[in-house]
Amino acid sequence: MATSGRLLCLCLVLGLVFESLGHPGARLPKDGKRAVSTRHAHDDPFAHEVNCGGFPCMFSCCENDVCMELNCEYFPSLGQ
């Protein structure tokens, strides 16, 4: 019984620690700016992003407006 109580306390403490490390939920900070820049994919020469029906597909191909990661008939080269 004592072991299960200790395990429960450990889980609660770890939950509080991990919650305090970042923003809880998917909301923006109060200044309206994102905490992490989304331009890192555009700066990486090896990143591959395809516009697929208005949604970006990273490291995959777009067939019939659906992101496919397997069974791609055509996969554009990274140099384009």
Curated annotation (Swiss-Prot):
Belongs to the teretoxin M (TM) superfamily. Contains 3 disulfide bonds. It comes from Terebra anilis. Expressed by the venom duct. This is Teretoxin Tan6.1. One of its GO terms (molecular function) is toxin activity. Residues 22-34 form a propeptide. Residues 1-21 form the signal peptide. The cysteine framework is VI/VII (C-C-CC-C-C). The keyword Glycoprotein does not apply. It is found in: Secreted. Disulfide bonds: none annotated.
